[in-house]
Amino acid sequence: MARSIKKGPFVADHLIKKIENLNAKGEKKVIITWSRASTIVPMMIGHTIAVHNGREHLPVFVTDRMVGQKLGEFSPTRTFRGHVKSDKKSRR
């Protein structure tokens, strides 16, 4: 079920404060966050946000096409190692 329009998008308070401070100063620094559930809003465009994937922070450069999506969508948590080439058990 989608979030109510009346409530507006969820963005972590600490993330909003950091972005507003950088926008006021006109700086472009990497912002480190663990908030994967935060929605990307237009004020984040042009910033690089390092999103935690459970092991490390992956840098995500925010563009205008990303607005409305969650930060966690751009930092995958699982690594795909590939299928085994000669797996005789699965062929039976």
Curated annotation (Swiss-Prot):
InterPro entries assigned to the protein according to its UniProt record, in alphabetical order: Ribosomal_uS19 (IPR002222), Ribosomal_uS19_bac-type (IPR005732), Ribosomal_uS19_CS (IPR020934), Ribosomal_uS19_SF (IPR023575)
Which NCBIfam families does the record cross-reference, listed alphabetically?
A: rpsS_bact
Q: What is this protein called?
A: Small ribosomal subunit protein uS19c
| PANTHER family for this protein | RIBOSOMAL PROTEIN S19P FAMILY MEMBER (PTHR11880), SMALL RIBOSOMAL SUBUNIT PROTEIN US19M (PTHR11880:SF8)
**MF terms (GO), sorted A to Z:** rRNA binding; structural constituent of ribosome
Keyword Ribonucleoprotein recorded = yes
Role according to the record: Protein S19 forms a complex with S13 that binds strongly to the 16S ribosomal RNA.
- What organism is recorded for this protein? Chaetosphaeridium globosum (Charophycean green alga)
Provide one Gene Ontology biological process annotation: ribosomal small subunit assembly
Coarse class of the primary localization is plastid
* Location(s) in or outside the cell: Plastid, Chloroplast
What Pfam families does its record include? Ribosomal_S19
What protein family does this chain belong to?
Belongs to the universal ribosomal protein uS19 family.
One cellular-component annotation, GO:
chloroplast
Q: Keywords on this record?
A: Chloroplast, Plastid, Ribonucleoprotein, Ribosomal protein, RNA-binding, rRNA-binding
Record's keyword annotation contains Aminoacyl-tRNA synthetase: no
